[in-house]
Every structure is written in C-alpha cells, then in structure tokens.
C-alpha cells in the first residue's frame, strides 16, 4: 500500500512532477515541479513573492526538488531558476508577455509557467508545454536547466 513519506510545499502548488535524474552517487533523485496555481501569500509560505517588479517572484520559474532516498521526508526545493528570463537583458518575462496577436485573434496570457515538463535524460533535454509555448531545456546540469 502506498504511504506518504514526505511533502514539499511550493509557492505555486504542483501540477506535474518530472523525474530528471537519479539516484545519483549520493542517493538523491532530482525532480522538476511545474506549478500552475496563483502564488501563495508569503504569510502562508515564506519566500513566495508576487509583487510587480520584484525579481524574487515565483512566476517564470521551475522548482528543482532534491529527494534523498535514505530519508525522503527531507525532500526540499534546492533551486527555482528563472527559466523564461531573457539571457541578454535578464528580464524575467523573456518570452510572450501577453496580449493581442492581431485582428480577429484572441488575447493570450503571458508565459510564466509550464503546464507539463517531459524529460529525456539520455539526450540531456526536457520539453515543456509552457503557457502556449513549446520550450526545450538543456538539463546537462539537472540543478540548472537552461532554455
């Protein structure tokens, strides 16, 4: 019978968990979390920010979770990289910022989260369905996915 052995609270909840690697030599598994909910209040979970212009925002990020096999109750977020940031400018909203696509089209929301992430460890790639964008990530270093 399955039994819960741990839990990790995230700022945007959890839609999909993707096992990226592991266990490694240290007995740890790396998981990416795709959160799609609104951001929790900081009073509910410390470190959750949603203030306009605050670069600490939980938007535009994917959580990297480390799970030690010898004690899964100690699983934790070890990084939350801003995977949508523009590499040249550093602007977090580096992809679609939302808006109208032209006459007789719909308005769409900004790209600030991934609905699903599928990983291909043998190729060091992950593919994300991210707010209407198909995105590839280099996961050569699973702790630091790069768009």
Sequence positions of predicted segments:
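Feature marking well-ordered beta-strand scaffolds used for ligand recognition
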Residues: 1-147
């Amino acid at each position: 019978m399955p039994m819960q052995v741990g839990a990790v609270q995230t700022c945007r909840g959890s839609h999909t968990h993707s096992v990226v690697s592991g266990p490694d030599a240290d007995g740890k598994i790396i998981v990416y979390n795709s959160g799609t909910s609104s951001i929790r209040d900081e009073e509910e979970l410390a470190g959750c920010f949603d203030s306009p212009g605050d670069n600490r925002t939980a938007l535009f990020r994917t959580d990297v979770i480390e799970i030690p096999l010898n004690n899964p109750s100690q699983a934790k977020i070890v990084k939350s990289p801003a995977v949508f940031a523009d590499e040249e400018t550093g602007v977090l909203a580096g992809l679609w910022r939302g808006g109208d696509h032209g006459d007789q089209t719909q308005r769409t929301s900004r790209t600030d989260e991934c609905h699903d992430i599928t990983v291909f460890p043998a190729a060091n790639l992950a593919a994300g369905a991210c707010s209407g964008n198909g995105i590839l990530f280099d996961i050569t270093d699973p702790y630091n996915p790069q768009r």
